């Protein structure tokens, strides 16, 4: 894996190519690039796979279950020397953020995702030729340094009411 100009070695972990494409698009024009990516195959033991990889400064984990798994194994705010960042939406990931095992968390708006998904599916069921659409949804970003369980938990839970 090549090191970027700033010397930070960041590994992205995902099993969803759509999420990876989103990261690539977001980085376009920023002068940043992905130095290493691990595409997780179904049922693959990702922690075993990580033992084979080079040391990283940060892991960006785009799969909520994997983020929980790595977050549980993190010690002193790091997983094998790497800070953890990722996408998650469970109370467990919020607790891991509060504890300091995860440094940054992106939380998609689960209510909006569910509502719009059902609306599109209903449109397709009711009208055979209806063309289903994709949507951009809202999300919240929480950083460990700015996160306080008492204040921010309500904001997190609000998107799931």
Predicted ranges, named:
Residues 1, 14, 99-111:
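Short beta-strand elements at the ligand-binding edges of bilobed clamshell
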Residues 1-10:
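A conserved helix-loop-strand patch within extracytoplasmic ligand-binding domains
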Residues 2-3, 28-32, 51, 71-75, ...:
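Sec-exported extracytoplasmic/periplasmic mature domains
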Residues 7, 112-161:
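Hinge/cleft segment of the Venus flytrap/periplasmic-binding protein
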Residues 17-23, 35, 39-96:
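Hydrophobic alpha-helical
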Residues 40, 88, 109, 139, ...:
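Residues at the C-termini of beta-strands that transition into short coil/loop
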């Amino acid at each position: 894996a090549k090191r970027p100009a700033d010397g930070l070695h960041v590994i992205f972990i995902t099993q969803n190519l759509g999420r990876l494409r989103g990261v690539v698009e977001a980085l376009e024009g920023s002068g940043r690039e992905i130095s290493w990516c691990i595409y997780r195959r179904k049922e693959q033991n990702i922690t075993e796979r990580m033992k084979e990889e080079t040391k990283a400064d940060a892991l960006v984990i785009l799969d909520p279950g994997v983020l929980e798994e790595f977050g549980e194994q993190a010690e002193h705010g790091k997983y094998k020397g790497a800070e953890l960042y990722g996408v998650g939406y469970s109370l467990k990931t919020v607790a891991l953020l509060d504890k300091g095992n995860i440094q940054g968390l992106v939380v998609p708006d689960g209510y909006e995702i569910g509502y719009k998904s059902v609306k599109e599916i209903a449109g397709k069921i009711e009208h055979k030729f209806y063309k289903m659409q994709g949507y951009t949804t809202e999300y919240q970003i929480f950083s460990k340094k700015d996160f306080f369980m008492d204040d921010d938990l309500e904001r997190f839970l609000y998107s799931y009411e």
